[in-house]
Amino acid sequence: MLELKGIHKYYNPGTVNEMCLFQNFNLTIDKGEFVSVVGSNGSGKTSMLNIICGSIPVEGGQILINGSDITKQKEYKRNQRIGRVYQNPAMGTCPTMTILENMSLADNKGKRFGLGRGVNKHRVEYYRELLRPLNLGLEDKMHVKV
């Protein structure tokens, strides 16, 4: 479960350009629930996601995942539990790595790792099957850098 409790977020606080984005904002998303966030440009959709992921700090309130308070956690710590798809695809990939390496990295997110191989050869066909329905030919370009 994801909960936002009493979130307060201001841009440029204490200046003539101060803008209140969220004031006592609350949201609860239960496990397995599918949610669409809809709004006009500048309404705070992306900012809300950035707040949840830790890219933007809040002035007040709590962010809870399964009852655990992550409000003060660093972004990299939250990323162990939160996955996201960026509006700019380049933000969620490593351009010096291949499609296969990027998929493997995402597949292993949150798992323990060592100094072994980064790509599990047993998962390559699985990744191809994930890419095939996109009809972009990416399944044949798995070893091409992003």
Residues covered by each model-derived region:
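The feature captures the beta-strand-to-loop junction immediately N-terminal to the Walker
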Residues: 38-40
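Helix-to-loop junction immediately C-terminal to a conserved catalytic motif
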Residues: 53
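Conserved ABC transporter NBD signature motif
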Residues: 61-69, 131, 143
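Q-loop/switch helix immediately C-terminal to the Walker
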Residues: 96-112
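Conserved ABC nucleotide-binding domain
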Residues: 130-146
